[in-house]
Amino acid sequence: MNIAILSKGETLYSTQSLLKAGTKRKHVMEVLDPSHCSLSIENGKSVVRFHDEIVDDLDAIIPRIGASRTYYGATLVRHFNAMNVFSVVSAEAILQTRDKWTCSQLLSRFNVPIPKTILGSSSNLEYLLSNFKNESVIIKILEGTHGNGVILADNYLSALSTIETLKTAGVKFLLQ
């Protein structure tokens, strides 16, 4: 099979591991940097170009899309799907993983245990915090990655102050 890894970092360990594993299984492997892919629809057909060369020989793609390129990465995966190229991860799954509340809902749907989690949408901040009975509260921004946007509030006043600031700034968050 001809397989492309969609990755900005060809030298990353995870990308190299996938390349080696695919090559070991006799697949033809390559890395396509999504930022060098252009998409078009020509004569009713989806077309992907990589550095101005049409990509039309792939059987499958392995998306490794960074958080900063989520929307474009999902669009690229959909475009390859329209070209009958299999993807190990759907565009919808890529989008779902970027939102912590959506992930929590999906985990709950399949009975995966997670800590008590409350969406920070209520205008009644005291009610939100009353669910934690003077315990430390972890406040997570919905779209943060790699630990960015995770705040530990050690007490009620700290949590209340942080939540008020986030709500004033229009930042979506959850509490655990």
Annotate each predicted stretch with a short phrase.
Residues 1-88, 102:
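ATP-binding N-terminal substructure of ATP-dependent carboxylate-amine bond-forming enzymes
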